[in-house]
Design a protein with these regions (language model features):
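Long extracytoplasmic/lumenal interhelical loops at the membrane interface
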Residues: 34, 148, 254-315
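Hydrophobic transmembrane helix bundles of membrane-integrated enzymes that assemble
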Residues: 1-257, 302-383
């Protein structure tokens, strides 16, 4: 009996702390093999499959049928859309697509249930250690031009051991907001904040620069006393100008790119062209009225890599609204304050301009940080 209680306590306290390490280091190993052996390992995928089964059986054991009903509803909408197309329904690629979209809702709800019975601190602490470890590698990569740690092969950017630019982008956006909400006065916190901000700039993605600019504006408007708001706004303009200058210093060819391809294509990194050449023709040639409500996709090549448009392509208008509602309720538990409203709005803006947020099964583990810091913040306000 005592042994059983100890196992349960360990599970609730450390399960998600272990998952962060497994997700991070499995992708790190995969990036190493991809770079040095031109071979992508299935290790990250296999780990995620095992975790899905563990969490699935946990939900069944806890008799949490509401989560399953939500997933089945979204799956049903997807199937309706697919049946309206003249393509095979039971296609491995299509199953993978909908599975990736369902995973965040499944994972966030599972995390919420487990953390209700466990401690958050080990999870937060491991997250901070990953920030420090990856940031040190990232800065070393920047200083010594270590190609393994690069974000892109063709332009500036270093992301440490993250395998994709999307994962590193959202990881550092979440890390910045996590530290903004934590806001402790200690040498460790100052070090963690400094190394996170420096690393965020070195990652070199437009989404991180955009988030930093939005955060600076938010602080200037809502966190600074009215008497000092004008000074704060001037300071914000200066900082934003510095960030913009840094971006163009690191990417000197970007201005030429804007002149050649246009501002929209530069901001969206060719995603507007993908939409016009792949997504829109597919919709025009294959969709019926039903598909506008429940979506319909043939393969990943139809995607524009614009988050909200790809969601609409997969689940249609009704499916997208239902999905976003379920996603929001999975992430935000309780009364939302202006800080978290800022994060949600910023996230929507960034997702609208970029891709792979909903489609990445790795980003969701770091979203659990946002979910739990939100709950912790609510508990401190109410308690």
């Amino acid at each position: 009996m005592l042994y059983s209680k100890l196992i349960k306590k360990t599970f609730y306290n450390y399960f998600f702390a272990c998952i962060i390490l497994l997700f991070y280091f499995s992708e790190a190993v995969s990036k190493y093999y991809l770079y040095y052996h031109s071979h992508k390992l299935n290790l990250p995928k296999n780990i995620k499959i095992v975790i899905i089964f563990l969490l699935f059986f946990y939900l069944i054991y806890q008799k949490k049928t509401k989560i399953m009903i939500k997933l089945l509803l979204l799956l049903s909408l997807f199937i309706v859309g697919q049946l309206s197309l003249n393509y095979d329904l039971l296609n491995v690629e299509k199953i993978t697509i909908i599975a990736k979209y369902l995973f965040p809702i499944f994972f966030l709800n599972s995390a919420y249930l487990i953390f209700k019975k466990g401690k958050k601190q080990p999870f937060f602490k491991v997250f901070e250690y990953v920030i420090i470890f990856n940031s040190i590698l990232l800065i070393i990569g920047f200083l010594f031009n270590v190609k393994l740690f690069k974000t892109y092969t063709h332009r500036f950017g270093f992301n440490g051991l993250f395998i994709t630019s999307a994962t590193s982008t959202y990881f550092y956006i979440i890390a910045i907001f996590y530290l903004f909400m934590k806001n402790k006065k200690s040498y460790y916190f100052y070090f963690l904040s400094a190394i996170t901000l420096v690393s965020s700039v070195i990652v070199g993605t437009k989404s991180i620069f955009l988030f930093l600019m939005l955060l600076i504006l938010f602080i200037s408007f809502y966190k600074i006393n009215k008497k000092h708001r004008i000074k704060a706004m001037i300071f914000a303009v200066v900082i934003i100008s510095i960030l913009a200058a840094l971006f163009f210093i690191f990417e000197p060819s970007y201005l030429n790119f804007i002149k050649e391809r246009g501002l929209l294509t530069a901001i969206l990194s060719y995603r507007d062209e993908l939409f016009l050449k792949e997504t829109l023709p597919f919709i025009n040639n294959n969709w019926s009225i039903i598909n506008y409500f429940s979506g319909g996709i043939n393969n990943v090549l139809n995607r524009s890599q614009l988050g909200l448009i790809d969601l609409f392509l997969t689940l249609g208008l009704v499916g997208s609204i239902v999905y976003l509602y379920f996603f929001y309720k999975s992430l935000v538990k309780g009364k939302i304050n202006k800080e978290f409203m800022f994060f949600i709005v910023s996230l929507i803006i960034i997702i609208s301009l970029g891709g792979n947020f909903f489609f990445s099964s790795t980003i969701v583990i770091y979203l659990v940080v946002i979910q739990q810091i939100f709950i912790k913040n609510n508990d401190s306000v109410n308690g």
